[in-house]
Structure formats: C-alpha cells, structure tokens
C-alpha cells in the first residue's frame, strides 16, 4: 500500500497491484522511498477526468531521468473512479508521473498502466484544487510525502 500525505493534512491510501504491474509498482515504491515525490504537486487536476502528480518540475514535463515500458496486460480497465495509473507521453515513456481517475475513462484502456486503486481518502481526492497547467498561475496542491506501507 501507499499513503499520499498532503501538505494540508489529508491522506489518500492506495492499494498497489504489485502482482499485475510489478515493474511499475517497483518504480513507484523506489521513488517514494527515495523521497522523490516529497514536495511535488498535483499539477494537473481536471474535472470529470483525473488528478495528475509526480512531476518534480510541476509542469507536466518532468520526470526521474529515465523511462520504462508499459504493463498493459494487467486485467484492469479504466472502468471506475479511484484508479492509480502512470501518465506518459506515448508507449514506453513512463517515468514518475501518475494520475488517479475521478470517473471511468475507458478511452485510456491500453494506453496507460493501471497499478493501484484508492481505498481510503476519497474526500481528499474530491477536494483537490482543479488546475489546468496551461492556464494556472498558482501551484497545485502539495504532496508532503508518499509513504509505502509493507503488507
């Protein structure tokens, strides 16, 4: 499991699909344990779509300095709210950016690796400040840290 602790005190707890998406989960856990996500923001939060974070630049263009392949045969589809998936710029461009869905987004099936699901903190997800990075002047809501809870 992972807990996204927000700077304002809210928390979102996520179950990670390590059996279905082991490379993606390993990358997320590694970055979280290194403190990579500490102080980053939800830089792109679009109504009726998703909340995206994990970019150290806060613009949508940043990452960890490497990319890795997609894991698309997980057996999951974008059929509901609360799915955790990798943001990318096309096939094989996963890095550090992730998103959590607000609604079913079936048009993303086969394009993004789903590697977890929100299990607590839906109120925190709902409370994230809407933000279009192309027009926003204020930074997004700040992630204090992402803590990995071993089960």
Label each PLM-derived region with a short phrase.
Residues 1-151:
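Cyclophilin-like peptidyl-prolyl cis-trans isomerases
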């Amino acid at each position: 499991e992972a807990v996204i602790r927000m700077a304002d005190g809210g928390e979102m707890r996520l179950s990670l699909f390590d059996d279905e998406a082991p490379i993606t989960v390993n990358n997320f856990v590694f970055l979280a344990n290194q403190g990579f996500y500490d102080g980053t923001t939800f830089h792109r939060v679009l109504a009726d779509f998703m909340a995206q974070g994990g970019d150290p630049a806060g613009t949508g263009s940043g990452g960890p300095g490497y990319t890795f392949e997609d894991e698309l045969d997980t057996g999951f589809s974008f059929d509901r709210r609360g799915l955790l998936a990798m943001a990318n710029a096309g096939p094989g461009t996963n890095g550090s950016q992730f998103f959590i869905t607000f609604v079913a987004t079936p048009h993303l099936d086969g394009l993004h690796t789903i590697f977890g699901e929100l299990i607590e903190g839906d109120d925190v997800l709902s409370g994230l400040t809407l933000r279009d990075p192309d027009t926003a002047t204020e930074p997004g809501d700040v992630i204090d840290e992402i803590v990995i809870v071993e089960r």
